Design a protein with these regions (language model features):
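Catalytic beta-strand/loop signature of glycosyltransferases that borders the donor
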Residues: 382
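Extracytoplasmic/periplasmic solute-binding protein
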Residues: 204
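Extracytoplasmic/periplasmic ligand-capture domains
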Residues: 2, 6-14, 26, 35-38, ...
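Membrane-interface helix-loop-helix junctions at transmembrane boundaries of multi-pass membrane enzymes
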Residues: 19-20
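Active-site-proximal polar cores
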Residues: 379
Length: 420
């Protein structure tokens, strides 16, 4: 692979869980006009496709020609028992994997409880069925010796503002103040506690924990503070000029926010929280309701004013988040259409540096610029909860790869006692 310029994060991308080598002959034989071979997945990994029923089931079997890869060695004291059992074994450990595609959350959890699934990512809307308020397993799961693996996802949730929108966009002081006020008016702690059922926490900075560029000493995000939000609005002329109970723009025109949303019960909860919080500071908000793919099309065309999204990294590099604000990505990953010359220059410079203090300094400066202009309201870091039956061997939570199939095995001697 020959790069057009030094890009040290490329190695992390190539070694992430979503990257794999594909033989040139496969692309030549099965590739479509875009060079993809999605209908004929032939890779070079530890498993090969045995059976595929679209939208229902995937069966993988161990690749007999896979290169010799031993189980990785760990010096972590917490892994001693794991190392004693797995050290030196060749990957993949298990010969067959069945992936059952169950779209609805309730049937997924039921399948796990009945022992039809060996492990499960706990559906966010069913966390209360599995965990106690202190985030420990409920007694019936403990009785079945189910293990809980929990950690913060390498991701963020945020609400972006269209920087080209005549109401919320722009780089002047009063526009920055409006976006910052909207952020202070929104109660992320309530979102995390009520809507996300305690499975999230307020995000202090743009790059989440566990990812390069995260600085534990840096706090850039604003906290929920409706009183300060009101004062900031008053200071920059966002006041009620006609006595209708809603604030207006400094030039006297009505101030109305329009946020994208999807027609689901979960999205309605977010909409209600936004409506209630903004009403408390005198701002009117309306919702543009469309299916998610249609909202994405509108966003890429610059037709949405605001929209709430999430982003998750598959590698240890923080550029997956910074790239969402990089000017040349406007209309693609950069849905806010944020363009700031200093940010873009620092982004280009930092990409040419290896991970270290010099690059970390540039990434922190980019974060400071981001919070200075507030093209997003940064919301939360989310938690991952994986529940695993005792007959599954080798499971260790890796938030960058929550399905580590080659490293897992099944202990056939352990009695299968599902959740009652």
């Amino acid at each position: 692979i020959k790069l057009s310029y030094p890009s040290y994060d490329t190695l992390a991308d190539l070694t992430s869980s979503i990257s794999s080598a594909v033989a040139r002959e496969v692309i030549e034989a099965y590739g479509d006009a875009s060079g993809w071979a999605m209908a004929n997945p032939v890779g070079t990994g530890p498993y090969r496709l045995k059976e595929w029923r679209r939208g229902q089931k995937i069966v993988l079997e161990a690749n007999p020609t896979y290169r010799e890869v031993p189980y990785p060695v760990s010096d972590d004291p917490a892994d001693r028992a794991l190392m004693a059992k797995m050290k030196g074994r060749r990957l993949p450990l298990i010969g067959r994997i069945e992936v059952n595609i169950i779209e609805e959350a309730n049937p997924r959890l039921l399948a796990f409880e009945q022992g039809a699934l060996d492990y499960l990512e706990v559906p966010v809307d069913l966390v209360a069925n599995v965990l106690e308020p202190n985030n420990t397993l409920k007694p019936r799961f403990k009785a079945a010796n189910v293990a809980l693996h929990r950690g913060i996802q390498p991701g963020i949730t945020f609400t972006w503002f269209n920087m080209e929108d005549p109401v919320v966009g722009g780089y002047t002081k009063e526009k920055i103040a409006l976006r910052r006020e909207i952020g202070m008016a929104y109660n992320v702690d309530e979102e995390a506690k009520v809507i996300r059922q305690g499975q999230a926490e307020w995000a202090s900075q743009l790059i989440p924990p566990g990812v390069s560029g995260h600085d534990p000493s840096f706090i850039g995000n604003t906290k929920y503070d409706p009183a300060a939000a009101k004062a900031l609005l008053d200071r920059y002329g966002y006041v009620d000029r006609n006595g209708d109970g809603w604030r207006d723009l400094p030039d006297g025109r009505p101030l109305v926010l329009k946020k994208g949303t999807s027609p689901s019960a979960l999205e309605r909860q977010y909409d209600e929280l936004w409506s209630r919080n903004l009403k408390d500071v005198g701002i009117k908000i309306e919702f543009v309701t469309q299916k998610w793919p249609d909202l994405l099309k509108m966003a890429r065309l610059g037709q949405l004013q605001m929209w709430q999204l999430g982003n998750r990294s598959t590698s240890t590099e923080g550029y997956g988040f910074l790239g969402l604000l990089y000017g040349p990505n406007a209309g693609l990953g950069n849905l806010a259409r944020f363009r700031q010359a200093d940010f873009d220059r620092l982004y280009d410079e930092s990409k040419r540096l290896p991970d270290g203090p010099e690059r970390a300094k540039l990434m922190r400066r980019m974060s400071e610029i981001f919070f200075g202009y507030t093209p997003w309201k940064l919301n939360a870091y989310r938690y991952e909860n994986m529940i695993v039956y005792p007959w599954v061997e080798g499971y260790k939570l890796n938030v960058f790869n929550i399905h580590p199939w080659p490293y897992l095995d099944i202990d056939t001697k352990t009695a299968r006692k599902p959740v009652q």
